[in-house]
Amino acid sequence: MKAWHVVLLMCLAVVLGNLPGIIAEASASPLCEYRSAAHIAEHGGKVADDAWHIKHGELPSCDESPKGEARRDNDNRDGGKSRFCRKRWYC
């Protein structure tokens, strides 16, 4: 009988331990959207653009462009290196 209670309590502990993950799963979502300067200018500036998008249930515009766009101009930094050296920082 005691063994049955121990097994039941262990199963209950496993279920209760996983319950927060079942009820509310964590998810990451952006707090803003990247929009072009032309789009922001179309609405009359960043403040007006943010107000318009929030009014229509959308995310506001981010302050700067994504990090991927900032590095696009630096793609040719390994241009003269061999394939072996491109993979190593010390070549």
Swiss-Prot record:
Pfam families: DUF7199. It comes from the Viruses. Residues 58-81 are annotated as: Disordered. InterPro entries: DUF7199. This is Gene 76 protein. The gene is 76.
